[in-house]
Every structure is written in structure tokens, then in C-alpha cells.
Amino acid sequence: MAARYPFRDDLEIATILSRVSPRYLAPVIVLGGCLLIAGAGTGAVAGASGNPLAGARLYVDPDSNAARQVAEWQATRPEDAQQMAKIASTSQADWFTGGHGPAFRQQVAALTRRIVRARALPVYVLYNIPRRDCGFYSGGGATNGVAYRRWINSFATAIGNGKVVVVLEPDALAGLDCLSNRGRNIRYALIHYAVDRLARNPRAVLYLDAGNSDWKRVSVMAQRLLRAGVVRARGFALNVSNYQTTKASIAYGNRLARLLGRTHFIVDTSRNGLGPWSGGEYWCNPPDRALGPRPTTHTSSRFADAYLWIKIPGESDGTCKGGPPAGQWWPEYALGLAQRASW
């Protein structure tokens, strides 16, 4: 069965899907001829020298929605369960979109401990900027700047000084055109604050979100990243929750990296296997899309640290095209992504 999934990278993803029959996972835990041992729950990344993600291990959540879906389907829909296992066995980022006070700190700290105990590298997304998503499908965020700073402080306290990857505020810079001049200045200040606060941890690997290759001109995005404090971060993230091809993302990222003094970037490849849709609202639950390349540091650019699954495949983009509210699990959409994957 391994021949059906000829992965090019050497990212090793093992899984602790204890509730799932191993025969449904076998096709996806054999990577490049290297058999992984069920129970490890992590995956190893190998990459270029100087890359902070090289040699890291990525966490696979044994209780993810995809894992639960595999368990639910394995008796009655075995072929679909096998397809869903592609998602269940692949590392994905963990998102924090709100919360406050001791409960939030405990949530972050508990997850961080669990991942570290698995000898893995936490990959987190912070998505709580005030006026998030300009009030559209993923609208919300902190009530004001004071609340946001407190939230960032709580997160920073919870992760401590351990090594962690943080993707900071998807769409916040690319999408700030909906704000007034004062609102834009406030947003720049808040993201800059987040960068400064998180950078106190010298082991934090920070990437500011830079939209996608089909959104803003490179020169515009470079200016926005600089105002937001990218010089204190590792670099920027591209294509988060979007569908632009890896090739287009790398080309855009290379140009942007050079403008910023040869900084580095990561690309979200979770759902870009067939590129963007050509219809309206192409970014919101487009039909007939596919999973993209699995996480790896074997990229096609010396500036690109990794391809990662930052968006969780199968979570809705919003109430468009028949989808549930943003962030809710949509199993049939997830299944379609897996079925159309090239691997």
C-alpha cells in the first residue's frame, strides 16, 4: 500500500490514534520507505543548516476531529476512513482565538506540556487581533488593545522559555485596509507589541502573517511587515488558510524575503494541492480542492524554512457554499480534500 503515497520529503509523522484500526493508517504512516512506529505521536523534520525548524518533531493530535472521524467511519465507511487518515496522521498547527485570565494560561500551558512530553515542537497560531477578519466570517477578536496586550502577555507567560513556533495574526496586515488610519496605526502597534513580547523568549520562532501571493503587492506587504516589527521575528508566513499554489507562494515569498533583507518564511500547504478556485469568494470553502504537500523543510527556496499545515483541513472557512460557521468541522469537505490529494 505504501506505493500509493510516494512522499518526496523525509518528514516522519507517527500517530497515536489508539482508537483507530492500524490497517486504516498503514498507507499513511509509511513515508519514503521508513516505517514509523505507532504510538510516537510526532514526526521528524530535516532541513537546511541554520533553519530553526530543521530536526524538529511535529505533533500529531490523537484526538483531532479527523482522528475521531476515522474512528467513526472505520466500520461502516472503511474507504472513506482510509482517506480521512491522511489528515489524521499529519501534523497541523494549534490555533488560539480567544480566552483570558488563568483559564487561558492553563489551556496554553497544558497543551504545551503535552506536546513537549511527546518530544515535539509546538506550532501555534495566534488569531485574536481586535476587529479580526474585518468582521466577516471569522470576525471577532479581543475587545480592544488593552485586552489584546493582556492576552499576549498571558500566552507568553504560559509558553515560558521553551522552543515554540508562533504564526502571528493571519490576515491582520494584508487585511487592514478595512480600518481607518487610526485603526491601522493601532493594529501595527498591537502586532509590534506581540512581536516584542514574544521575542523575549529567545527560543520562540516567530512568523508574521503576510497574506498570500494573490492579495497584496510585494512592496506593500514589505512596508506593512516592517511597520509591524518583522525585523525582530524569524520572518513571515504565507498562504495561511488559503489555496494558492506552492510555486506561486515561493515566488512571492522569495521577492518579499529579498526586499526585507533576506528574511525567511513558511508556507501553508494544507489545502493548496489543486491551487485556487476561479469562482467567487475563492478563499471560502471552494469546491473541488485538495490537500497539498505534507509538512517538510525540504522546500524549493533557501528562504523558505518549511511547508506546514497551518490551517486545519476540514474546518470551515465560514458560512459560504453550504459550509458551517468558520472553524467548525466539516467532515465531507475534509474527505473531498483527502480524496483529491495527489498522494
Model-predicted regions and their roles:
Residues M1-P22:
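N-terminal secretory signal peptides that target proteins for export/translocation
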Residues I37-N51:
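C-terminal region of N-terminal signal peptides and the immediate post-cleavage residues
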Residues G55, V60-A88, S213-L335:
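Surface-exposed substrate-engagement region within the catalytic domains
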Residues W95-G101, F136-G145, D177-N185, D209-N212, ...:
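Second-shell loop/turn segments in exported
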Residues L121-V123, K163-V167, R203-Y207, A233-A237, ...:
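Structural preference for beta-strand elements that scaffold enzyme active sites
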Residues S138-K163, P170-A204, V218-V220:
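Active-site cleft segment of glycoside hydrolase catalytic domains centered on the general acid/base Glu
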